Structure formats: structure tokens, C-alpha cells
């Protein structure tokens, strides 16, 4: 991907398009942790891509491209959230038509199960879980993206895992009562 980024920095529009196609689904998943409306997410991704394209020549470290784009997206999500979504949101069901076109059935089931588990978590916990488990970023890398202390990232991960365990245990207890 670094080679494509360097080409895009030199003005190659096709290289930029290839990069976007590689990271678009990841950006969607990250935006979905904060914004529930698919149209808003599409607009945010488009705005992020426009801003990325305008400023790609300023990027000094091509290996940090994805982190840079995620930072831009998160900032845009936070601005929209403050402006439009004042109350706490939960994650909606996916717009399945769009999603099914882009992903295999197994991926869809895995992602829906994952989102179902995290939908009631606080935003900070959701975004850290997504970045850590789905994007496989290290705690250190996440702290740089979100501009928070590494220990805060660890705390969010711990609390998120504990809440998920608690919710799973409660669901098991309900199932036992029904049986």
C-alpha cells in the first residue's frame, strides 16, 4: 500500500482510488461506532476522502496513512455527533443491501454479532474495541489515533470486555430460566 500512497502523493488518481477501495469498509465500521445514520456515514467518508486527497502530499510518513485517515474520520464523526446527535445513540442494524454487496455472508454474520455485543457500550469503549480487535491496532497506536493516554485505552478495553462478559452472562441466565 505504501507504493500506492507514494503514487497518490505524486498525483496518481487511480492509485488514490485503489487505496480508498482497500480501506473503505474499515472506515465505515469505525464511523458506525459513533454515527447511526448510513447516509451521514457515507457523507463523512466522502468528506474524509476529499480532505485526504487535498492534503495527501503533506503526509510525511506513508506507512502512517491509514492512521492519519482514521484520525480525520474520527474528528469528522465527533463534529457531526456534537452538531446533530446530542443524545446517546445505539448502533442501528446495517443497511444490509449495501453491506451484503461488499462482504461475504460469514463476514456479515461475524460483524453483526460483534456489533450486537457492543451496541450498548459507551462510544469510547466501542471505538477502542473496533480499533483493537477489528483493525488489530496496538494500545500504543490507538492512543496516538485518539489522542488519549495508553492507560486510558487499556481502561476502556477492560471496561468494555467486562460489560460484554456481564451482558453475555445475563443472557445465559435468561436462557436457563426459559429452559
Listing of model-derived features with the role each one plays in the protein:
Residues 57-60, 71-91, 159:
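Arg/Lys-rich amphipathic alpha helix in sigma70-family domain 2
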Residues 3, 7, 144-147, 161-179:
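C-terminal edge and immediately downstream basic/flexible tail or linker adjoining helix-turn-helix-like DNA-binding
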Residues 22-25, 33-34, 130-137:
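Short helix-capping/turn signature of helix-turn-helix
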Residues 79, 87-112, 116, 138:
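Internal acidic/polar
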Residues 9-18, 28-47, 145, 150, ...:
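Short, charged helix-capping/linker segments at alpha-helix termini
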Residues 9, 49-64, 84-85:
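Sigma70-family region 2
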Residues 116-127, 135-152, 163-166:
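Helix-turn-helix DNA-binding module
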Residues 23, 156-159, 163:
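Residues within the DNA-recognition helix of helix-turn-helix
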Amino acid at each position: 500500500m505504501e507504493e500506492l500512497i507514494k503514487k497518490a502523493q505524486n498525483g496518481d488518481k487511480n492509485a488514490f482510488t485503489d487505496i480508498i477501495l482497500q480501506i473503505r469498509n474499515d472506515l465505515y465500521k469505525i464511523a458506525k461506532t459513533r454515527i447511526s445514520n448510513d447516509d451521514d456515514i457515507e457523507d463523512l467518508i466522502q468528506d474524509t476522502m476529499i480532505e485526504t486527497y487535498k492534503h495527501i502530499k503533506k503526509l510525511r510518513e506513508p506507512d502512517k496513512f491509514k492512521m492519519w485517515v482514521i484520525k480525520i474520520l474520527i474528528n469528522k464523526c465527533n463534529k457531526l455527533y456534537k452538531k446533530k446527535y446530542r443524545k446517546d445513540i445505539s448502533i442501528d442494524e446495517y443497511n444490509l443491501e449495501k453491506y451484503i454487496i461488499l462482504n461475504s455472508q460469514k463476514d456479515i454474520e461475524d460483524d453483526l454479532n460483534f456489533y450486537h455485543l457492543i451496541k450498548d457500550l459507551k462510544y469510547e469503549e466501542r471505538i477502542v474495541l473496533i480499533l483493537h480487535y477489528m483493525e488489530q491496532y496496538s494500545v500504543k497506536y490507538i492512543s496516538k489515533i485518539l489522542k488519549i493516554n495508553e492507560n486510558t485505552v487499556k481502561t476502556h478495553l477492560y471496561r468494555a470486555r467486562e460489560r460484554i462478559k456481564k451482558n453475555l452472562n445475563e443472557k445465559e441466565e435468561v436462557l436457563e430460566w426459559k429452559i
